[in-house]
Each structure stands twice: as C-alpha cells, then as structure tokens.
Amino acid sequence: MSGLGDSSSDPANPDSHKRKGSPCDTLASSTEKRRREQENKYLEELAELLSANISDIDSLSVKPDKCKILKKTVDQIQLMKRMEQEKSTTDDEVQKSDISSSSQGVIEKESLGPLLLEALDGFFFVVNCEGRIVFVSENVTSYLGYNQEELMNTSVYSILHVGDHAEFVKNLLPKSLVNGVPWPQEATRRNSHTFNCRMLIHPPDEPGTENQEACQRYEVMQCFTVSQPKSIQEDGEDFQSCLICIARRLPRPPAIMGVESFMTKQDTTGKIISIDTSSLRAAGRTGWEEFMRKCIYAFFQPQGREPSYARQLFQEVMTRGTASSPSYRFILNDGTMLSAHTKCKLCYPQSPDMQPFIMGIHIIDREHSGLSPQDDTNSGMSIPRVNPPVNPSISPAHGVARSSSLPPSNSNMVSTRVNRQQSSDLHSSSHSNSSNSQGSFGCSPGNQIVAGVALNQGQASSQSTNPPLNLNNSPMEGTGISLAQFMSPRRQVSSGLATRPRMPNNSFPPNIPTLNSPVSMTSTACNNSNRSYSNIPVTSLQSMNEGPNNSVGFSAGSPVLRQMSSQNSPSRLNIQPAKAESKDNKETASILNEMIQSDNSSNDGKPLDSGLLHNNDRLSDGDNKYSQTSHKLVQLLTTTAEQQLRHADIDTSCKEVLSCTGTSSSASANSSSGSCPSSHSSLTERHKILHRLLQEGSPSDITTLSVEPDKKDSASTSVSVTGQVPGNSGIKLELDASKKKESKDHQLLRYLLDKDEKDLRSTPNLSLDDVKVKVEKKEQMDPCNTNPTPMTKPPPEEIKLESQSQFTADLDQFDQLLPTLEKAAQLPGLCETERMDGAVTSVTIKSEILPATLQSTTARPTSRLNRLPELELEAIDNQFGQPGTGDQIPWANNTVTAVNQNKPEDQCISSQLDELLCPPTTVEGRNDEKALLEQLVSFLSGKDETELAELDRALGIDKLVQGGGLDVLSERFPPQQATPPLMMEERPNLYSQPYSSPSPTANLSGPFQGMVRQKPSLGTMPVQVTPPRGAFSPGMGMQPRQTLNRPPAAPNQLRLQLQQRLQGQQQLIHQNRQAILNQFAANAPVGINMRSGMQQQITPQPPLNAQMLAQRQRELYSQQHRRRQLIQQQRAMLMRQQSFGNNLPPSSGLPVPMGNPRLPQGAPQQFPYPPNYGTNPGTPPASTSPFSQLAENPEATLGNRNSMVNRGMTGNMGGQFGTGINPQMQQNVFQYPGSGMVPQGEANFAPSLSPGSSMVPMPIPPPQSSLLQQTPPASGYQSPDMKAWQQGAMGNNNVFSQAVQNQPTPAQPGVYNNMSITVSMAGGNTNVQNMNPMMGQMQMSSLQMPGMNTVCPEQINDPALRHTGLYCNQLSSTDLLKTEADGTQVQQVQVFADVQCTVNLVGGDPYLNQPGPLGTQKPTAGPQTPQAQQKSLLQQLLTE
C-alpha cells in the first residue's frame, strides 16, 4: 500500500501530484471528490500488488471492477495469514540464526542485482517512454551478442523485429493511447505484461554477404515488462515513466521429427481411388515407395480371422464418419519393422453430383513401432475409445471381456490388450464381436458399427447389438456388460480395429466368421456407394429385437447409417450358420452397395427393374413410415433379401434379383430395398414364410425363419422367399405394419397365399368388402401390389362409386405413406401391377408380369382405388391385344389424382403393365400372361353390347373415350382389332400431340401431351365432376385409361362406323385446319402451334375406308363452302363491329370465352358430318372445317354481339379475317388457347364485351382472361344435360382447362387440347371442363371445330346473344357454336370441330355440352334435335 506521506492530500509531496496524474486532483474543491480519487488510486495499487497478470486487466478497454479488486485483496490477505500460521507451527527453532534461510535477507543491494539476473536466465533492460534503452544488464551479451555499451541509449526498436514493434509499443505507451479509452488513474498504475518478441542477434564482425544474412537472425525472447508510471528520483536524476523489461529465451520446442505419412482416397466401396504421397516425399526418406506399399498391404491384410483394418475402418467410417485404427506392423525388405496407424474420415463433396469418399491418412510410427497396437494412442475413433468410459472400472481381467457387443476388432484388441488371460472368453466375445465387426467388416461397417455404436452409447451393446447375431451365446451377453466396460478406457482401441486374438473361445467357434455372414449380409449393404451400410441391418435387427435399445442411435450416426439400416434388412443381419463366406460377403457387399446405389438412384427417378420393390423407394422416402412394420415381417423379408443378395448373381444394377422386398428395417426409417423377382420361385414357395408368420405369432421365430432361408437353396429359394411377389411382400409389410390380425385380413392374405399363380389367374373376384379390407391395410402397404389381375371385376358401377368413396380416405394416407410413389412410378420395376391394388385378389399375378412400373406409384393411392376398375380395363386392353402394351401413362404421375386417377390409371396400368412388365422373363410368367389375356378376351367376348357398355361406364371408359384417352392408347398400340374404342383412341391421338400449348396437357407425357387432357387442371379445375367422372378428374381427358380399349367382343357396327366417320371427320378437319392455319400462321402464333399439332394429328390417322373417304370429300366440300361463307361473314362482322362501335368482341377475340358455356347443343353429331352439316339455316352445311361453324350462324346473332363475334372470328380465323378484322382480333382468333398468346389488341373490342357478356373475348388483354370466368353467366344455358357440370366449375372443367379463365391469357390451354379432351363422350363430363379453357382460348377457335356445339339460344340467357332458336337443336355442334356468340363460337368452332368429331364418336350431346362456353358448360342436351338423335348412337352404346 502506499505510504502515509504519499497521500495526494499532501500538497508538499510532489510525488502525490505526479501520482495523481489528473489535473482534476489539484483543482478539486470537494473533499469528497478527493476521497474518491484517493480510493481509486489505492484500489489500483491493490490490483497491481495482487495480480501479476494485471495484463489481463490492461487488455480490457474498461477499468477493473473495484469489487473484484477488493475481494481478491481480502482473499490474498487471508491466504497470507493462513500461510503464516502454518509456517509458525512448522518452524524449527534451530534455524533461527542470522544466516538461516528463514531470517531476514542480509544480501546487500549491490550483490542482489547480479544474483537476480543470473537466476532470471535472462537480461534486464529499461526503456523510457520514447523507446530508448535507458539501461541494459551486462548479460545481454550472452543472449544477443551485444555489449552493454552498444545498446545503452539506443532505440529499442533497432533490436526488435519490425513485426513486434506494435506489440512493444502497446506495452510501452499508456493505455489511453493504445486502447483509445481514457483511464483517469492511468498515470498511477503499474502494469505487468508478458509477451514474445524477436530480438536481433548481433551480426558477426566480418562483413560479407553471409554475414549480412546472419545479421538478420533473430532470437525469440520472452519479455516480462512492468511499466513504472511514476517518475523516480534517484541520485538527483529524475527518471520519467519507463518500461522495465526482463527478456529470456523461449524454451525451444523439441525438434519435431518429420512425420512420415501419406493419404489415400477411397470410394464408398472401400476401393482406393488415389494416393497422395507428397508428404512422404517431403519427408525426404529414401525408400518411401516401399514402406507405402507395405503399409497399404498391411492395412488391407486380414488380421487372422478378423477382417483387415481397412475393412474395419471402412465400416466404422461409413457408420460414424470417422475412425482410426490401432497400430499395425509391417516389415520392410531390409528387415526393418515399422508400425503405422490410419485415420479415416468420410467426406461429402459439396457438389451433389460427386460421390462421397473416404480420406485416410496413414502415419508411419518409427519411434513407436515397438508399441503394440493396443498401445498406439493414435488408434483414433475406435469404438472402444468412445465407450471405454462406460465402465472403465471393470477391468478386463474380470473376464467380463466376453461382451459380444465388442466390435470384433475391439474385442480382439481389447482381449489382447486387456488381458490375454481372458483370452478365451474375451476372444469369444471379441470374436463374436469380431465376427460382428468382421462379418460386418466384410460387408458393412454397419455391423461393426452397430456393435460399436452400442458401445459408444454405452449400452450393453453386446447384447443389443449382437443378439441379432446370435451372439447371445457369449457369456458376455449374459452379463450384459458392454464391451466398453471391460475394455481398457484407452481410446486408442478402435472398434474392430484392434488386433484380434486369433484364439476363438467361447461359444463361438473359431469359425465365428459365420457371424461374418450376417455381417457380410450387412456388409453387402455396406458397400453401397449410397452410404447405405449393411451394418445397418444389424441395427435394424437390433431395433427389431431389442426395440429402443437397438436403435443405439445408429440412425443418429449418419445418413449413411440410416440408409445402411434400411438397406441391411434385419434379414441380412440374421446370423447364418457359421459359414466362412467372406468372399461372398465381399461380393455381396459390393453388389449390395451397387444395389443400394441403384435403389437410391431409383428414388431419384431412375427406372428400376420391375424386380425392384416399389417398397424401396417408398421406404427410403417414407423413412420411418415402415419402421412400424412388425419386426417379424421385416426380418423375414430382409433375411430373404439378404440371401437373395448373397446367393443370386446380382447384377450390380440391382436389377430384378436385388429387389429385396421386405427389407425395410424398422430401425432405419428409410429402408430402401429391392424386390427380388418373383420369377425365382413359385408363389406358394414365396409365401411359405408368410404362412408361417400367420400361423406363428411370436417374433421369437424370426431368427429361425431368417436362418431357414439360408438353409434353402442359395439363389432360387432364398430369392424366391425374399422375392415373394412384391405385392405379397407389400401385403406382408402392410399387415405387419398395421399389425392388424383381423380374421378378415388373414383370410384375404391366406387366400392370396394359398392360391398359386395359376389359381389366382382364375380366382373369383374378391368382394368389395375384401377389397376394402385390403385397401385399409394397404394404407401402410406399398402402393403396388402385384394384383393386376383383371379377373376381379366388381360391378363396374360399384367399383366406380365405392372405389372412389372407399379409397378416397385411404388415398390421403397412401399419399402420406407412399411419398415415394411418384418416384416409384418412374421406376419401371416398381410393382405397378401391384398397384392394381392389392385389393384385388389378383395379387397373385406374378410380379414379373406386373412389374408395371407404371405409374402405379404414380397412380398412388388412387391407383389402388382404381385397381378394381383397372383390372377390368386391363382385361379390355388385353382383348384388344394390347394388354401388356399399356403405354406408360405419361400423365399418370401428374394427372392421376385420387379419384380421377382410378380409371385413367387403370388404363395406363393395363397398357403399361405389359410394356413395363416387359415380356415375362420366365416361361411360367409368359404362360400366366397368356392365360390372363385369354381369360380377359373370353370374358369380354362373352359380353353383349349392353354389358360391355355397362362395363365401359363402370370403368369410365366412355369418359375416357370422350376425353380421348383411348385414342392415345390406340396410337401406342397398333389397333389389333377394329374395335371402335381403338378408332376413338386414334382420334384423340391426332389432337393430343399437336396441341402442346400451355394447355394442361403440356404436362402430360407421352401420347397425352398434346391432349388437352386437363390433367393440370386435375387439382385446379373448379369443375365439379360427378363421382363417375371424377375418376377422370378435369385432367381426365388424358387420364382415360389408355388400356380402356373397349371389350374386343364383336364391336358394334355402329361403333365402328362412328369411329371411322369420326376419324374421317377428324382427318378432314385436320386437313382443313392445316390449310386454314397456314393462312393464319402469320396472324396468330397460336395458329402455328395448332397447325403443327394438327399436322401431327393427321399423320396418325388410321387408314380410311370408303365411307370415311366419302365423308372426307363431303367435308372438304363443306369446308370450302364454309370458308367462303366465313370470309363473307367476317367481312360482315367487321362491318357490323364497326357499326356497333366494336361492341362485338373482336371475332378473333372469340374470346367470348365460350363465356357462355356453349351448351353443347343437342347431341353433337355422332356422324362424321359436322354437327352443323346441313343444319345451319341459311349457312352451308357446317363442314368439319374448324371455322365452318363460325360462319354458319352469323346472321343469327348479327344483332347479338355473340353471333357477330362468332362470324368475325370464323371469318378471320384463317387470314380470312385479316381483311376486315383487326389483326389483333385475327390473332386472337387464331391463337390457340394452348399458345396462351392472346393478343391484347382485342381490347378494341373490349368495350363491347361486358364482363357479364358471354361474348367477352378471351383474347382480351390477359386481365380479361377472367372473361371466361365471367362467361359463366352462360350458366343460364346450362341444360339439365349438363348434369353434374356446374357452370362455374364447368368453365374450369372445360377441356381447355380454361387456362383463359384461370389464366390471363385466354389462349393458354391449347385450343385443340380441348378437342382431344373435350371429346369426352360421356355426357360432357369433366371433359367439358377441358373444353372451357378451349373456349376462352378458342380465340384461335376461329378454327371452328365442327364438333363444337354452339350454345342453344335457349341456353343463352342474353336474348341478344341468343341466335335463332333453331340453332340449338338444328345446328350441328358447329352451328351451335355459332349460335352462341358468333365470335365466341368461331373460336370454339375449330376446337369444337375436333371435339365434335370426338363427340360424334362418343355421342354429341355430352361433348357438345361440354364444349359449351365455360360458364354455361352445361351440355345443352336439352335441345336434342337431329344432333341429339345422332349423338345417341355412341351415347347409347357408351352412356345411358
């Protein structure tokens, strides 16, 4: 503490002022302030006295806390008192002499300095605030080589390295200058610091370049500095504040020997990709190539019975991400023994395109070569390391060492290192472990990891980990002591890395390698480049057996672990009879890795073979969804899968064989598994295990079950077991997952299992109840059951309604459970056929037959819902001889919505089943297929027209026909029979491709793309579709089952004729359209699209018969005539529009978005003749020409803007309008909704169009695209025929999907799209929805579709808009269109022409009604004039 006289209150003491430093002290008038300042000063002095590390305080930019200083002072005083007391008690009186060490120092001041300096091992110097050395001790010479005189009064910076000047200044100058924060009492503070700086060594005297270099040598000195802020007066000299420094040499770190190491890069299969030897070369040792090779060889060399460290590390790394091995030895050619250890890390490149890889660093331990591997501290991440703490107290000696849980490597290591005394026990345990790890090592680190993981978690992993391996035998397991417990706490031991004693003891014989097999099974997974590791199977097994313990956090480990677990199905883990299958395991592992990769890729959407289980994708995506599946089933499935993998020559691509159906490990949420092709064994064989499961309820059987497959023949049986029909496996999963053992479920399952494939082919239909039960189960099942059997045919209607109602609830669950369905759908190998819906007894159909990758997954739950109808559809398709051809439903994924998908899916499935199924690979499969087809054919052939029609309705085929789905199918399948359905299918094809416009169909893939197929509208279309139609949601147009070919049974002549006529009409229409479009090409970009589409459509047209030719000629004539009329009408329209002040929507606008839904008038003509043909009063017969209709009604609505619009549109459609109509109008007219290009030029006419007017031109600037929606006023038109069609919804439902309504651009949906879809024959179902968009988009509809029905005047609410009443009934659909708003109709006419063709085929009314303006969309079935009669042909056949 400062002396009494030192107080700042003493004015006579000059020191006091200096100490205060603050001018405030002298000026302070308040004693209080003075007291505070004095208090602060003392506190700071206290701090200096108390702490040698005041530098800690200095480094702060804030003053030290007073309380802390006082507290420390108190503590220090107390400590001193205690020390004094202790001293007094221990002092020996004898030593109280003058020279005693305990007496006061008698060393004189002069001799103390040198002694202190000598003791300091450094030199002492003082630097003033200007940086000059005021004093330096003589011993500086021994440190820096300078004499004392040389340095005195020189700048300290001359001997400091430039880089250390700042640090020195920081200590020299006041804190206020350094930190920028004023410290009021700074002048009174003494600061101590320690820092390192480089001091220049005195260069040699001899000059020379070398000396110049030498002069730059610096010595790193550690400086301890104390700042003396107070000036010191000594001998009359006034020493200002200065820095007192003591510099000493830094203790030199021990010379670091160059580390000899090299790095390897391995892929996820463990293969070395590259070796980096740069550090070895840098070490400069000779012969590094040799010991690099020897080291790698030793690293990959098996350790006795245990796998090599490379394998062990690989497993551990894949599981945990990092691993390190114990030391392993190798001998160089010269006899030198070296040891090395390896550390590995799993690296994930940033680029998703790059595969993860393992970086390993191999460090040569020359000094430690003598150490045993156990002693190697570098062992790294060995599992034991992690676990040892678990029970370090237990010494290995306890003999507990046996824990099987010890990773083999660990246990070995542990055993060797822990106590060889336990050798046998330890070994056995270690062995079991090793077998674990080895086995796993052989395959996947997973096993090892599993064991290790358990250890890591500190669980008695031995039990949890190994039990699946049947390690229970080891006493360790009984004890439940985890390996970690008996293992030495040393970390170095890595699980599975430790050298394993080769003495197998314990229950496991030396061959314990058998354990390897399970591991190997696991290992098979382990190779997966996917990062799925076989070891996971172990985990999964554990989890299965042990439940929570098993998880052991495996999944937590790494994505790899998770995948591994999924991959390693418990079955893999199942311990198989002790077989040394290390090679097999390795191969399996590699195969499995590839398989897993393929599985993963399949998830990515790569097609998997039908063999692959859809489960894989689902499981992987569903992650935990299947974790619930019963352990028993999972193990059962996995076991078989494992065996399949092991025994079957598995294609690396993981083709059919690899599908491990059941391998969903409950532990790992994502179990991606492949399904083994069922072809390997008969159904009954495959079902044996399932039967057993049903009979035996206890999970305890799993092990035996899993072991049995091993006993079975290698590939075929085991594969077959695993390969149980994917559907079946799915069923099993489902059953176990739901764990419902309802008698009914069992009955269904047993029924399916008891039936052989052949039997199943002929199995009676399941009742809907059964189906329902199954479906419910299915909630947790894979979507795909291999139940494509079309045999089950619940009454069509029942199926329709019930399937929808029954399955809709399930669909949501399916969607949730089967998120991977879509992906699976992409996988051809997924059991699409199964998706037929396990509900059907047809499950028996071979998976090979029904690989139907089809969109079963795509179909999703709906596919299941659809399954029943699908079966029928399938049968129908077969009849047409296209049974297997089923196109893959391009739209299946997108379009198929729950209910709607049901039917379309069915079609697709049926057609795709064959395609995807690929011809059955086995004779049995082919025979089955033939039998199925024959049955279908015979069944259908036995039906009369009425029954077939009912079937069609039940299946929604009629709707499909209307939607044009069948046409697409026919395209894909050469029409083998002249069945009308094929013909109809042909027709939609024509349109489908051409209209790739923005119409929803654009989303469709495959033949449906062109189709308006409102698929996109599926979810979006507001249209409410009646449940039956619902099957084809607004997207239905595309959805129509492709396979819905009508029963081939003797096709009605009527149907054939209708088809032919329709096709003929379509061809003519296409030709006419093309011609017109050519004219319009310049005007409307849409026109161009249409044209190309039309051309495409035309090409596919089937050969024409005489009837068709005649029809075509008639149509050509009528079209030409119409064109002339249209031109005239257009001119008239232009005149009228001008006269009306543009009141009429520009003809091109036709945008009158069929705003009044053009209620299809009477039935659309069923005959090739355009509905308007000869019906238009005063107009030439409506030719099929797309525009003809527009021209026909011009007068009718001349007064009405609508009629005007129609004419204008019609006239201008092809450049015809060009003369009178604004180019914009023309463009609008020609723009096809698909193009979505609606010139906004229409705005001119906009004034005439009131939002309410049905005529509102869709082309009107996009803002008016809503016009279509406005059009709904047409709802007034809705005739009862519209039925379920709601006008508002109808607008959306229009075949054109009313892109216009929804989309600012009326034309967005392809005009023709609607045509293909609009054709829905069934009473203007959802197809109408599709048509609406067309209407709005019809702007191009100037190409009138003869098939388009104009709204009947009656239907039109607005009298002005109404054409003469006769048009409704009299006019063909084309005329009807005209009758609507001329402009609108004109746009629609072209679309409708196509539609009408379709309509003619299907039955004009519904279609025409659909074509009606969106708003009105109700098909105006009401006026059934000749058209109604005409439409009756197809409708009679197709609809009631």
UniProtKB/Swiss-Prot annotation:
Positions of the PAS domain: 109-180
Keyword Glycosyltransferase annotated: no
Region (Interaction with STAT3) location: 361-567
Cross-link (Glycyl lysine isopeptide (Lys-Gly) (interchain with G-Cter in SUMO)): K732, K774
The entry's keywords: Acetylation, Activator, Acyltransferase, Isopeptide bond, Methylation, Nucleus, Phosphoprotein, Receptor, Repeat, Transcription, Transcription regulation, Transferase, Ubl conjugation
Residue numbers covered by motif LXXLL motif 1: 46-50
Residue ranges annotated as motif LXXLL motif 3: 633-637
Gene3D superfamilies: 6.10.140.410, Helix-loop-helix DNA-binding domain, PAS domain
Residue numbers bearing the Phosphothreonine modification: T1179
Residue positions where Phosphoserine is found in the record: S22, S372, S395, S517, S558, S569, S698, S1033, S1185, S1372
SMART domains, per database record: DUF1518, HLH, PAS
Motif (LXXLL motif 2): 112-116
Asymmetric dimethylarginine: residues carrying this PTM: R1073, R1091, R1124, R1131
Gene Ontology, cellular component aspect: nucleus
Composition-biased stretches (Low complexity): 422-444, 661-682, 1415-1440
Processing and modification events after translation: Sumoylated; sumoylation increases its interaction with PGR and prolongs its retention in the nucleus. It does not prevent its ubiquitination and does not exert a clear effect on the stability of the protein. Ubiquitinated; leading to proteasome-mediated degradation. Ubiquitination and sumoylation take place at different sites.
Sequence segments annotated as region (Disordered): 1-39, 83-103, 368-445, 496-515, 545-626, 661-739, 777-797, 1142-1187, 1408-1440
Ranges spanned by the short sequence motif LXXLL motif 5, renumbered to the chain: 749-753
Motif (LXXLL motif 6): 913-917
Biased composition (Basic and acidic residues): 83-96, 615-624
Subunit structure: Interacts with PPARA; the interaction is direct. Interacts with PPARG; the interaction is direct. Interacts with ESRRG; the interaction is direct. Interacts with STAT5A (via FDL motif). Interacts with STAT5B (via FDL motif). Interacts with STAT6 (via LXXLL motif). Interacts (via LXXLL 1, 2 and 3 motifs) with RORC (via AF-2 motif). Interacts with ASXL1. Interacts with the methyltransferase CARM1. Interacts with COPS5. Interacts with the histone acetyltransferase CREBBP. Interacts with DDX5. Interacts with the histone acetyltransferase EP300. Interacts with ESR1. Interacts with GCCR.
Family statement drawn from the similarity comment of this UniProt entry: Belongs to the SRC/p160 nuclear receptor coactivator family.
Name of the protein: Nuclear receptor coactivator 1
Organism from which the protein derives: Sus scrofa (Pig)
Source lineage: Eukaryota, Metazoa, Chordata, Craniata, Vertebrata
Recorded name of the encoding gene: NCOA1
